[in-house]
Amino acid sequence: SSRTNPLIVDGGIESIERNLNDLGIDALIAIGGEDTLGVASVLSDHGISVIGVPKTIDNDLSGTDYTFGFDTAVTIATEAIDRLHTTAESHHRVLICEVMGRHAGWIALHSGMAGGANGILIPEVPFELNEVMGWVESRFRSHYSPILVVSEGALPKDGELITKDATLDSFGHVKLSGIGEWLAGQIEQRTGKEARTTVLGHVQRGGTPTAFDRVLATRFGLNAIRAVKDKDWGKMVALQGTDIVRVPLATATGVLKTVPLARYVEASAFFG
């Protein structure tokens, strides 16, 4: 994925317009997440013929129920959690699985529920450390070893994001890293139980796509071409229910689609 933001490059938009004209390109199909489609929306505002396709493992684009890549990432994370259960039980320790999710906790929520996690921490709901310790101790009292799934963007109440360093990419994002290790240290200090962290990182972004993602991407592609033929510029193809529809790029990127509190409360029935 490119981390270059043409909107902050001098003459970036003009350069894009010139290159498209020089190459005889009639339409641009932008495939990506909030940054890619955010740029696509601005390009559309400047009169460039653009159609968007939602591709991000974070599933955080508005206007679509699912983005392709999300189901594959959840499957990879779930398989990892399944494996972590074995070593957690054999060594009687706390296992923390840190997954991607800067602003939205969809991967943690879905993989945590599917993998039978005993606690899930997401960016949308700042957590109380004492509550997390309660989940851990409750699990050990039942003679089981706890598994916690944590989004990289999760943070404690009255706390700050755990970052790798202070540098920003061209879209203004900090490099997140370390919430899992930090939490493991807190658990060991407060409960005396051994805690280990597995950071899945970029393994979530590759590999063989699931059947769901293959079908979804195929349907998105077909409908993106139809939108081009219709000259329905400035739109993103989206999945709503079982239908592929078109929504304005500005709508898709205006507000991030985050995990509703009700979904997190639903999952919390299995915590501890």
Q: Can you annotate each of these PLM segments?
A:
Residues 46-83:
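Glycine/threonine-rich beta-strand-loop-alpha-helix active-site module
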Residues 3-5, 33-36, 48, 53-60, ...:
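Short, ordered loop/turn segments at secondary-structure junctions
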Residues 27-32, 40-42, 70-91, 95-194:
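Accessory alpha-helical/coil subdomains and C-terminal extensions
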Residues 1-30, 35, 68-80, 272:
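Glycine-rich oxoanion-binding loops at beta->alpha junctions
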Residues 160-163, 207-215, 247-254:
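Short glycine/threonine-rich loop-to-helix capping motif typified by GTGT followed
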Residues 182, 235-272:
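Phosphate-binding loop/pocket of nucleotide- and phosphate-handling active sites
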Residues 165-177, 203-221, 225-229, 267-269:
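Catalytic, metal-anchored helix/loop core of enzyme active sites in primary metabolism
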